[in-house]
Amino acid sequence: MLYQGESLYLNWLEDGIAELVFSAPGSVNTLDTRTVASLGKALDVLAEQPNLKGLLLRSDKPAFIVGADITEFLSLFAAPAEKLHEWLVFANSIFNRLEDLPVPTLSAINSYALGGGCECVLATDFRLATPDARIGLPETKLGIMPGFGGTVRLPRLLGADSALEIIAAGKDVSAADALKVGLVQAVVANEKLIPAAIKMLKQAINGELDWLGYRRPKLEALKLNKIEAMMSFTTAKAMVLQTAGKHYPAPMLAVKTIEAAATMTRDEALQLETQHFVQLARSNEARALVGIFLNDQYVKGKAKKLVGETPVPQQAAVLGAGIMGGGIAYQSAFKGVPIRMKDINEKPLALGMNEAAKLLNKQMERGKLDGMKMATILANIHPTLDYAGFERTDIVVEAVVENPKIKASVLAETESHISESTILASNTSTIPIAVLAAALKRPQNFCGMHFFNPVHRMPLVEIIRGPKTSDSTIASVVAYASKMGKTPIVVNDCPGFFVNRVLFPYFAAFSLLLRDGADFREIDNAMEKKFGWPMGPAYLLDVVGIDTAHHAQAVMAEGFPQRMAKDYRDAIDVLFEHQRFGQKNGQGFYRYQTDSKGKQRKEQDDAVDALLKNISQPKKAFSAEEIIARMMIPMINEVARCLEEGIVASPAEADMALVYGLGFPPFHGGACRYLDTLGSERYVEMAQQLAHLGAIYQVPDGLQQKARSNEGYYPSVAPHADVSHGQPA
């Protein structure tokens, strides 16, 4: 043993070849600050070995290096800019020393080499990969860019176009694709990886391979003439602007970094990369996107812990073959849980099966599955008009019309056809579980399971614990949701649960703005273009359905009369009365036409202005900032109330529910992260200026207390101790 660190060790192999093995405690290797420092110490040891002829990098884990340790990011980014800059210079000096070793170097990549793991292997002369390997740089998805030389080495190895595509999109590529673009020299079976690596190193040592020739391009300027450079970078910037937009600065800055560094040597280019990395790392967007990653890990970890040893339901059923029922049936069957789809008429059953077939055909067209797999999935959906076989189901999801009497009747009837251990769940979006449970003999086996539309695309499932719901029921439903490929978040019972409860004050704010003379198109524009929602409130209401929103609004008003009841006719009332139900009948706030691809495109409809004139004050211009404040404060206030009442357990779960269920702009990180970025004190001041507009603008007590203490929802992060040259401060 030449060197033993916490997360890597150094050994002699044979004939002057040393191996550096990444071997972190735990199940995966990450390139954290300690590992980087340890790599530096290993290189110190290698520098003292006169007989060194070659170096092999490998992992003793199932994956090479899965990336940097993202749990360190927020504390690293909290460090003063100059300290973070110093640490990156120190870290890059280590990768440069690896790259500059006076002997050939090779990385044997098994499974994942992502982020810092990819940047590490780029510093070696050769790379071999197993067939299952994935190699890439996902940093821009976290609001940052590669910081260990990725923007420098990858373009010089692959050429600008391939590197720009990987870096700007935060992509990883398969071993086969890596071989095509020249990222690896060969793809080798797992059991032959190390022998092949040693053989290749020996060829380099013996002069059969020009290892310095492989290394040289990484140290020099990019091989591009002016016209090639202009075409590559202009195209890349246009693509980034189209896909990432202005709210996500990392991809564009990464492209501009590569462009500016194209004529530089390695060391000059690294200085620019470091400067731009620090700029991004200290941005609100990076904090938000890293926060989402960590919150996602927390939510999924909590679900896994909650399930424990609970078995996944093996047989399911869904009541109702409408849009939601059909979507649930498709998703269950697609993920391997056979499901009975019951309805009272043949027509909806046929529509449900056709919808499933249509979704599967799209997967076939994309090459995601073959005809045999498609047939198997469709065979796992059993359309039925009766309860035959329901006694063998483990879980039944009710997805009939959103009417408490109808739902209660269907649930009670179903309960008489299932076993005593079968779980019943309702896909209600607003009706309290306690209300529906009153009709059941076994309320302990009942809970809410709220899917979002379209089911196959939306990642969130809100699981609602009723007053009598048992822990084992929740565990089984969480297990089923996870098996379906969804992110389950457990909330407590109230009208609207969590997501719809916080959505309707937002819609109420929209109605108030219209009443006060705002143009709904300007509101949509501000909320989409400026704030970053995928749809503004008018467009969202059209997609949800004006009739659905009108009904849900009444449920919410009954549940929370102080805040959500209104004493005036609003735009939703008017459109509902004129049977403008949104996309479902082609007219709502906008008019809809189906394009050649079958997608509905919205168009302006001047008739709406005439309808809304009677319930609105004369037209008045509002700034984007005014619109955003008036729209977002009621939603954030309701999120705060839900946290204070224990409807949702944590800021992390609240934020992920909003991102995954409503499309809350990820670069804001969710309502709690957004509030923390604004500052609770500033937020309360903004809300107080609008308090005259009504109860939805009243800040709850707990949030007022946070403002007085200048606290946020997330704990403040102390700067990382290891940013001073990789050592504990």
Swiss-Prot record:
- What reaction gets catalysed by this protein? a (3S)-3-hydroxyacyl-CoA + NAD(+) = a 3-oxoacyl-CoA + NADH + H(+); a (3S)-3-hydroxyacyl-CoA = a (2E)-enoyl-CoA + H2O; a 4-saturated-(3S)-3-hydroxyacyl-CoA = a (3E)-enoyl-CoA + H2O; (3S)-3-hydroxybutanoyl-CoA = (3R)-3-hydroxybutanoyl-CoA
Q: Which InterPro entries match?
A: 3-OHacyl-CoA_DH_CS, 3-OHacyl-CoA_DH_NAD-bd, 3HC_DH_C, 6-PGluconate_DH-like_C_sf, ClpP/crotonase-like_dom_sf, Enoyl-CoA_hydra/iso, FA_oxidation_alpha_subunit, FadB
In this chain, substrate is annotated as bound at: D296, N500, Y660
- State the Gene3D superfamilies in the record: 1.10.1040.50, 2-enoyl-CoA Hydratase, Chain A, domain 1, NAD(P)-binding Rossmann-like Domain
Q: Which residues form the signal peptide?
A: none
The record's active-site residues are H450 (for 3-hydroxyacyl-coa dehydrogenase activity)
Checking Pfam families in the record gives: 3HCDH, 3HCDH_N, ECH_1
Pathway field of the UniProt record reads: Lipid metabolism; fatty acid beta-oxidation
User: One GO CC annotation, please?
Assistant: fatty acid beta-oxidation multienzyme complex
- Keyword Oxidoreductase listed? The answer is yes
Residues the record marks as site: Important for catalytic activity: E119, E139
Question: What are this entry's molecular-function GO terms?
Answer: 3-hydroxybutyryl-CoA epimerase activity; delta(3)-delta(2)-enoyl-CoA isomerase activity; enoyl-CoA hydratase activity; long-chain-3-hydroxyacyl-CoA dehydrogenase activity; NAD+ binding
Q: Report the domain of life of the source organism.
A: Bacteria
* Annotated region described as Enoyl-CoA hydratase/isomerase, given as residue ranges: 1-189
One GO-annotated biological process of the protein: fatty acid beta-oxidation
Chain segments carrying region 3-hydroxyacyl-CoA dehydrogenase: 311-729
Function statement: Involved in the aerobic and anaerobic degradation of long-chain fatty acids via beta-oxidation cycle. Catalyzes the formation of 3-oxoacyl-CoA from enoyl-CoA via L-3-hydroxyacyl-CoA. It can also use D-3-hydroxyacyl-CoA and cis-3-enoyl-CoA as substrate.
Q: Which family does it belong to?
A: In the N-terminal section; belongs to the enoyl-CoA hydratase/isomerase family.
Quaternary assembly? Heterotetramer of two alpha chains (FadB) and two beta chains (FadA).
Would you tell me the protein name for this molecule?
Fatty acid oxidation complex subunit alpha
Taxonomic classification? Bacteria, Pseudomonadati, Pseudomonadota, Gammaproteobacteria, Enterobacterales
